[in-house]
A protein has these predicted regions:
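Glycine-rich, low-complexity intrinsically disordered segments
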Residues: 1-84, 88-121
């Protein structure tokens, strides 16, 4: 897989910064209020993290042990994450999307962006 961009968190907010060759893919995105961002848990892309299948009580009111597929844990066989985010602004010329929040670190690779469609998501 080849990342299409990265997450940038700074004093101005949270941004998705696209690689130049993917900027044309932003066309008409401004017609949507939210996007699904698929990103890579790059800080947990280690063999030992990829072998974790169960985790202890990740949620305060959850069961004592849960399978990783029932959690948002970064420790999983394929460290892929999905976050729905509200679009604040898009800049098609610069390849930027400002969003309200992403639970990803600065520099995190972004794998894909899809419009959030309530009837499908």
């Amino acid at each position: 897989m080849k990342p299409i961009g990265t997450v940038r968190n700074d004093e101005s907010g949270t941004w998705i910064v696209l690689e130049p060759e993917y900027i044309p893919g932003l066309e008409a995105l401004e017609g949507f209020s939210h996007i699904n961002v698929i990103w890579w848990f790059s800080g947990h892309d280690r063999e030992k993290d990829r072998s974790v299948l169960r985790t202890e009580k990740p949620y305060r009111d959850g069961p004592g042990v849960m399978g990783v597929f029932a959690t948002r844990s970064p420790l999983r066989p394929n460290p892929i994450a999905l976050t729905a985010a509200e679009i604040i602004h898009t800049d098609q010329e610069k390849g930027l999307i400002r969003v309200t929040f992403l639970d990803a670190y600065n520099g995190t690779p972004v794998l894909d962006i899809k419009p959030y469609t309530p009837s499908l998501d």
